[in-house]
Amino acid sequence: MTDTALWGIATTAAGSEGLSDRSDWSTLTAEGTLPDSMIGSGFGFEYRSDLPMLAEAGIPTMRWTLDWSRLEPHPGHWDSDAVDHITDVLTVARTAGIDVWAVLHDGPLPGWFSEDQRGFDDSDGLRLTWPRHVDRVAETFGHLVAAWVPILDPYTRALEGHLIGSRPPYKSDPGKFLEMLLTLHRASFEANRLLSSGAPPVAVCIDTCPVEPGVMSREPDERDAARKRVESVDCLRFGSWVRELNDGVISIPGLAEREIDGLAGAYDLVGFTYRGGSTLFADGTTKPYPIDAPVAPDGRAPWTEGLGVTIRRLADNFPGRKFAVLGTGLTAHEDDRRAEVLAGSIFETQRAADDGIVVTNAFWESGIDGWTPECGFDVPNGVFDRNRDPRVSAELLRAAPR
């Protein structure tokens, strides 16, 4: 039997500390498009007591974002106060016995980068600005982090910004969506190339979502059309990573393939997020999978068996690799539901270990009730409430197999 995953907690910079006023998402809260993030969970003020509290609760690891918009609020200006703050957070975490997996990009970006300089839409953003930032972060904090995650949920980043248009730069252009997806694959690998010279391992992030075709009638053509849609989405979301990590080729349907030296077998860990499955219909509309899965207030429908399905699919496509669940969770008022989903998720990682699949770490979203872009502060998402009182779900994390 392989050792089971080490379960920790995950949070974003915005969720734990609120959005920086230099972030490109800050305008969304000012306009009322997103709920006010204020100070998030308050972690930025309470981390000196929060981290020992989490360690005492048996939590050994934390995924946390090093906020670029705080570190570099203006182009070329490295904010010493932000550097000192992040250094202190990482130092306190290490002293408490908590390993931090540091994320470099999880959605919000500095406004000067994404808006004034067109961000990753501009070739200089990918070739010059992003590598310079990665290098500086690695040099400053590399001795204090346990692992790196260059870009969290790259498919979702491209989808929201360039197809749905719900996040900066607010585009709804299928061609731009494909180009941005390609660019984020390249940006992730460029960060891996720079970070891999240091000691902490680097994890790629595949934001997974099992998709099944759905029908509203008995027409065979409808099922065929739904199946083709599923194949198209799956090729973009999952299949592109199979070509990339196995063959060294970034293959985004509709764009020219790019073979990149060193890409095959890249990254120390194949990381992934999992937040439920989806049913996709011929007309492009979606529902949860299974259809009757209860939908949480943030619109997601956790399906714990799907986590096991996803782990096995990853193991089949990336034989011999090590894996990490970079994010899974539940935003809901009912902690008994949260405990049920957490217990089921722990069971699936244990079952994978019993089958010889190496899942080194798993991260539950989140530790302490904080801000989410979908629900603001209205719906709890932590195993601790904002008063730092533990819920039943916190005891499940403590009892998770080690």
Where would I find each of the regions flagged by the language model?
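Active-site region of glycoside hydrolase catalytic domains
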Residues: M1-A30, P75, T87-D336, F347-R402
